[in-house]
Structures are given as structure tokens and as C-alpha cells.
Amino acid sequence: MLFIDFCKILDKIEKTTKRLEKTDYFVELIDFIKTNGKPENLKQVSQITIGRVFAEFENKEIGIGPNLLLEAVKTTGISEKDLKSKIKETGDIGIAVENLSSNIKQVSLFSQALTLEEVYSTLKKLSEIEGNSSQKKKTRIISNLLILATPVESRYISRLILEDMRIGMNIPTILASFSNYFNINKETVEKIYAVTNDIGLLGEKLISGSNIENDSELQLKVFRPIKPMLAQLTPSIEAAIIETKMPQFETKYDGARVQVHKSDGNVKIYSRRLENITNSVPELVEEIKKIDIDNIILEGECVAMDLSSGKPRPFQDILRRFRRKYDIDKMAEKIALRIYFFDVLYYEKGLIDTPLKDRREILEKLFGTNNWDTELSKIEKEIFSNKMLFSSFKLNSDDPILAKEFFNWSLSIGHEGIMIKNPDAPYTPGSRVKTMYKVKPTLENLDVVVTRAKIGMGKRKDWYGSYEISVKDYEDNLHVIGNVGTGLTEDDLEKLTKIVNEIKIEDLGEEVILEPKIVLEVTYEEIQTSEKYEMGYALRFPRVVQIREDKSINDINTLDDVKKIYEIERNRK
């Protein structure tokens, strides 16, 4: 399949803002591949359309930043001055390269047109290049691609290299296209994607005529992590009890979500971003290997513990453990970790359609019961132990007074609050569900993505000191909700400035526009209505709590979350 044929449809998708039209254009693309291409072409275009050449669970990226791309573009014959001027004018490196493509040194007029397969495989290879001369090799490969490309191809190659296609397409739109073209129930397609995290594989299977509901490659598998199920906000414990009937309450731990996979004695541990963190936590791996059970996927919260106080250490200590590559054993001696497991997603077979109460029963056979109302003395003793693996502390009750006591106790041992779960509910990967709620004592912190950065003043003049922050809507469009600079230490500012310089895509002088890759957790005095921002809301006195290196743009809060918090707080006043 020629890459230019793909780019023509990408151009149509980019030019419309209507989601239904984008869906129709992708259906047109599927039909073109069905007639003129191969099954693997749908795998390739499904990934490329959302700015990827790897499946999400593979934990790989092309790994090229804007600066290296600029260097590669310069070697094609485009001057740095013209390139920077055009980027400033258009705000888009892809459009800039396309507009300046007449300056690119062309190879023979008889050179073959680029194929989709060639572009896809070439960009996958970029991630594998390492060593002292890796930058030169990557620059040469990118340059060669651009020299062979037509103007519109150069636009999309440049954007794909940065993994930001800027065409307004996302996973739900592609899934809707699959559903329409192959005449399959949308919920079925969404569910199968949720257990594979591989839009390309799903597309290839569909166009090959697979019975996707019974295809073994499209089932939940050990060592292929899935996105976590997410909780809703609730205005009160009483409201959540009404929604969940006889709920299961659990402590909401001050830690990091992890997924543990075990099969044939092998253990892998994944973060909420599906990163493989196994090598960073060897003591946990050894403990899990001792469990007399196999072929299982567990979910829990990893907590850094201060064993002298029985309370969790700061969240940054967990990240220090997860990011550590050297002297891991020494770090393990300084920062003790434990996991509180709260779910079993797979045991010999997928369990996500099984009610929570039955999944919990399996969990308790492995790690004990930890019922707060009947085993409190045992729980409080074990909090100070060297034990590493626990089942989460829980309470089954519909009594709001007892639930509030459990909530206050969870806060007293240093954790964030409680979770309220429907015991009859299945597990829905990657979705924010109405069968699980979270209760915290203060305003819910927000996870936001940085979209711009501005040079600081005074003591901060050597760093980017102020950051524009945004949330997303259901179509993954970003909406500015404020600017933040307070709460950041000098170490934070130095770290952020380094990252900003790697991911800036447009320089406006004292301010730069960024790829949306930095996630911050922020607190604030309140959410208020505002005409300043298009979304209609703004954070009053936002303050950075921490840099969330464990989260990506996929994990940030939504416009709906902001509206819900605003309504909850307004009703409390």
C-alpha cells in the first residue's frame, strides 16, 4: 500500500472537526485496504492514525524529540532560519516541513514512491538504535525518509516521528469505525480492545475475518497488561451507598497502582502506565514467587512504608524506587515497599466478568481477609511488620456511620481515604465506572498536562517557572484550566526545564508550546467559573503537589471531572 494513499485520507480526517465525518473517513480507509491492501495494513494505519507504531502495552516509543527532528530536517536542505520562521508562523512542524518541501534535496526522479510498510518499519527501527553514534544514525534515517516523501507525506511523517498526528483522531473513533464497517456491536469491539490494548492487532484480526469474541489472541492474557478501572467522584458516603447497595469499602492507599502478572514461576510487575517495573522491585518479585499459585493477574497499590510509624512515606519515594536502574538493593534497604492487593483479574482464565465478591474470595485465599470490623487488632499489628504482601483492608456494610469510622481510621494511618465498590460489579478496564467511588477528606487533586511553559522571574530566571495546565474532554481535546508555578522546588524546576527543552515544539520567546507529556498533580483552593478560558472553569490558587512521572496524558482528569467537583463543592456550601 502506498503511503500517499493513506496520507490523502489522513488529510480529509484532519480537515473536518466533526467526529462522525472522521469516523466515515476511517471507514473509507478500511474499505480501501480491504480492496487494495493486506490485513497488516489495517494494523499499521490504526496505530499510525493515533501517532504510534507500537501497541500501548509494548512500552516502546519512537523516542525522537523535536530538537533531533529539526536537525534531521536541516540535513535535507531546508535552512534552520526558514524552518524556525515557518514553525513560528504555523505552530506545527509538520505543516512547516510540508510548506518548505520544495527546498528538500530530491533523489532521482525515478525513485520509487514510499510504501506504508516502509515508513512503518523504518520508524519502528528508530527505537532500537542505541550507542554513541545513535543520534547521527537516527538523523540520517529520518532525513532519507523526508527526501523520498511528497509534501503531504512529509507533514505526516514529521508528526508521526513526534507521535502527535494532530488530526483529532482517538481510540474511540477508530473503534466506532471498526464497529460500523464490520457490523459488530460497538460494546463488543470496545471490550476486546480494553483487554488487549492493541488497536492494530484488533484491526488486523477484524479485516482477516476473525471471530473476535472467540479468538484466543484477543483474550485477556498474562504478561499483556491492561489499563486500570477508574473510580468516580461521589458527593458523600451516603450517596455512594445508595448507588452500590451493600458496598465493599476499602482503604484508599497513598501509593502507586500496580498490576502483577505471574506464570510458570515468572513474575512481571507493571505500573498504571503499563511500564514494566519488575527490575526495580526485586524484593517484591521474590515474595510473589513464593505464593503457591500460578497463571494469575493481580491488581493492587504499591506503598512505600515507614515501618517505625506504620505510615506511608511520600509518593516520590515510590517513584524513586520505580525509576532506579542502579544500586537497586541499596535503595531497597532505604525504602521498604509493600503491595496491598484489591483485585484478581485472571486466574487460569479471565475473571473480569466475574463479580467483585467472587474475585475478592480468590484474593483472600492468597493474602488473608483483613476485615476491618472484625480483625482490627491483627491489621494494626501487621501494619508495623516486615510483611510485603497484603489484601486491602475492607469493610462490608451499608451503615454510613460505620463507614465514616472506617474512613477516619484509614486517614489516621496515613492514607488518602476510602473506596466504595459494588460487590456484584465486573471489572471494566480503562473505564471510569459507576460501580466504584472514592472519598477523600479534601478537594480532589487534579492530574493535568502541561501545554505551555514560561520563563521565570527573579530567582527563577534560569528555569521555566510558570506552566499552563490543561484537562481533556471525551474526544481527548485539551482545555486550559489555569497556570501554576507554586509548589515547585528548585530541583523540580531544574527537572522540568530539562524536559521542556526536549519536548518544546514552538518557541514564542519567553514562552514555549509543548508536546503534552508532562503530568502534574495539582491542588487548589476551589474551582470557579471563568470567562477567561474556553472551557468555562478555572482553578483558584493552584499549587503543584508533585510531578506525576507515573502518569501520561491518558491518565489526566477530564472536563467532566472538573464539572463534577465544581457541582459537589457548590452543593456543600
Curated annotation (Swiss-Prot):
Keywords for this protein: ATP-binding, Cell cycle, Cell division, DNA damage, DNA recombination, DNA repair, DNA replication, Ligase, Magnesium, Metal-binding, Nucleotide-binding
EC identifiers of the protein: 6.5.1.1
TM helices/strands, residue ranges: none
First-tier enzyme category under EC: ligase
GO terms of molecular function: ATP binding; DNA binding; DNA ligase (ATP) activity; metal ion binding
Catalytic residue positions: K252
Cofactor entry: Mg(2+)
Entry keyword Ligase: yes
GO process terms (BP): cell division; DNA biosynthetic process; DNA recombination; DNA repair; lagging strand elongation
Catalytic activity line of the entry: ATP + (deoxyribonucleotide)n-3'-hydroxyl + 5'-phospho-(deoxyribonucleotide)m = (deoxyribonucleotide)n+m + AMP + diphosphate
List of residues binding ATP: E250, R257, R272, E301, F342, R432, K438
InterPro entries: ATP-dep_DNA_ligase (IPR050191), DNA_ligae_ATP-dep_bac/arc (IPR022865), DNA_ligase_ATP-dep (IPR000977), DNA_ligase_ATP-dep_C (IPR012309), DNA_ligase_ATP-dep_cent (IPR012310), DNA_ligase_ATP-dep_CS (IPR016059), DNA_ligase_ATP-dep_N (IPR012308), DNA_ligase_N_sf (IPR036599)
Protein family (similarity comment): Belongs to the ATP-dependent DNA ligase family.
Classification via PANTHER family: DNA LIGASE (PTHR45674:SF7), DNA LIGASE 1/3 FAMILY MEMBER (PTHR45674)
NCBIfam families with a match to the protein in the record: dnl1
Function: DNA ligase that seals nicks in double-stranded DNA during DNA replication, DNA recombination and DNA repair.
Protein name: DNA ligase
Lineage: Archaea, Methanobacteriati, Methanobacteriota, Methanomada group, Methanococci
Gene responsible for this protein: lig
